[in-house]
Amino acid sequence: MKKLVSILMAAVLLLCAVPVLAEGQTYTVGVCQLVTHDALDAATQGFIDALNEALPGQVKIVEKNASGDSVNCSTIVNGFVSDGVDLIMANATPALTAAASATSDIPILGTSITAYGVALDMDDFTGTVGGNISGTSDLADLE
């Protein structure tokens, strides 16, 4: 259930951005996923499917897997920044942390992030990250 909610939230965030995109333009999206795992794979695939449905033929996806190594996340997202991608999707906390450190200009969507405040070292986190970062959490509502 958490997996489905995360995928749906990522799709909603994406679809909110669609009206501001120029028709006929191609966008490059870098996807950095920490490790191969069923839940992370499903979140990434749901994101890619939503992008391709919303912008058929307009999105080039560059998908990279860090093989469980946070140093690889940094290398991957720094490559995305150097390549000038239009959006970074960071799947898992180390990927988000690396992306946040790599750029304050390129929009970043995080998914499968348990605690944004902890991931981004924000002591005064109120539920909104601000800046160039947004996304979904995999933290279960315990109420």
Model-derived regions, located:
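Short, low-complexity disordered leader/linker segments with a strong preference
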Residues: 1-28, 52-56
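Beta-alpha junction/loop-to-helix N-cap segments that form part of ligand/metal-binding clefts
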Residues: 65-124
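Extracytoplasmic "Venus flytrap"
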Residues: 27-48, 62-73
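Hydrophobic alpha-helical segments within soluble ligand-binding/sensing domains
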Residues: 116-143
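Alpha-helical structural signal in soluble globular domains
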Residues: 46-54, 98-102
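A structural micro-motif
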Residues: 57-59, 106, 131
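Residues that mark the start of a beta-strand
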Residues: 26-30, 107, 132-135
